Structure formats: C-alpha cells, structure tokens
Amino acid sequence: MQKLKQQVFEANMDLPRYGLVTFTWGNVSAIDRERGLVVIKPSGVAYETMKADDMVVVDMSGKVVEGEYRPSSDTATHLELYRRYPSLGGIVHTHSTHATAWAQAGLAIPALGTTHADYFFGDIPYTRGLSEEEVQGEYELNTGKVIIETLGNAEPLHTPGIVVYQHGPFAWGKDAHDAVHNAVVMEEVAKMAWIARSINPQLNHIDSFLMNKHFMRKHGPNAYYGQK
C-alpha cells in the first residue's frame, strides 16, 4: 500500500499548490479495488506537516486497518461513491471558492464554452439539500447517497464532479491525480461561468454540436487529442 499512500499524499499536497484549499478544508482518496482498501487523508492534519506515512488506510466499511490518525471526516462519502461506481479510482472534496459559491447558490455550473466541454459532458450538476433527518443521522454517508441520487446510472467519468447544495464540490477520476486534475478544472470553469454570466446574464449554453466535438475528441472511442 506504500505506493498508493504516496500517490494519495502527493495528490493531497496538490490541493494547496493549486489554490483549492484553505487550512485543512479538503481531502483526496484513492482505492485499491483488488484489496478492497481505500487510502485517504487524515482528519484535520495540516498540509505543512503532513507526510505520506500519515495517510490512513480503511476497508470498505470504514474500519482503519493502517495508520495512526483518524481518517477524514468525509470518509463515508468517499466509500459510498466507490461502492456505487466501479470506474472511480480517486475522489477529492474541497471548498474551493467559485465551485463552492455555485453549491451555496444551489445552481448547476453551466456549460458555456469549450474549456468546460473538454472535461464535463454537460452542466456540472448540483444535489438537493439534505433533510434535517439526513444531517442529524449518518451525515457523511447521506451526502454520498444524495450525490448518487443525483447522478443515477450515468457514467461518472463523463461528468467527473458535482456540487453538493450548501456544502461544496466533489470531483473524481481514474486515480487520485486525475481526480485532483478534474477538481482544478471544475474550479476554473466555475469561475469562468460566474464571470461570463456577470458580463452577459442572458448568455446561452454552449452549442450542443460544439460540446459533443470537444468532449468526444478527448474522451470518445475515436479520441485524437493528445498523445498515445
């Protein structure tokens, strides 16, 4: 597990490097599906002092199997998403400013241009609010459930992120680094959408044919963006 712990540590350290977190407001995890184990950031540990060996290993029930610290308080959310979507290899949660602003506003992040379409096939969705019962009960587990309720049976890697109402963004990917990459893009397109709609409140969504072209040339079966 040392290799995965190092990967998760590096991905977590990317959060402050890319300006996605303030203090300890974020966490990254990754899963080893063969072993049924998840590596995640420890709860409340400062990035300045954190080391790879501080990463916590839990099983799919959330039981700590390796590590001296308690795992992230959002662990149950991560585990619920891993259980539901086998294509996910890494998950990240932050309170990055612009994506969180859309979450607090209770609005999807609209697909307005090609930067968005290169990564997200359509609007970045938002969840409903959790009920008082859901919050007072198994809050973090129910956060995962409301994300799943919103995504349904869609392929999560086609829209690798969501904003949880009144909370903040979650993003995911094929591994921990891919998840952070998508979280960075999510923050950038959230900022772009806010600025664009401020300039032109009547701005329409990106044309569907342009969205299809940009997404499929990068992610489709005949993708030709980048190198093999």
Curated annotation (Swiss-Prot):
What's its top-level EC category? isomerase
List the catalytic activities from the record: L-ribulose 5-phosphate = D-xylulose 5-phosphate
Q: Which GO terms describe its biological process?
A: L-ascorbic acid catabolic process; pentose catabolic process
Give disulfide pairs as residue numbers. none
Q: Which GO terms describe its molecular function?
A: aldehyde-lyase activity; L-ribulose-phosphate 4-epimerase activity; zinc ion binding
In which family does this protein belong, per the annotation? Belongs to the aldolase class II family. AraD/FucA subfamily.
Q: Which NCBIfam families match?
A: PRK08193.1, PRK12348.1
What's the protein name? L-ribulose-5-phosphate 4-epimerase UlaF
The species this protein was found in: Escherichia coli O139:H28 (strain E24377A / ETEC)
What gene name is given for the protein in this entry? Answer: ulaF
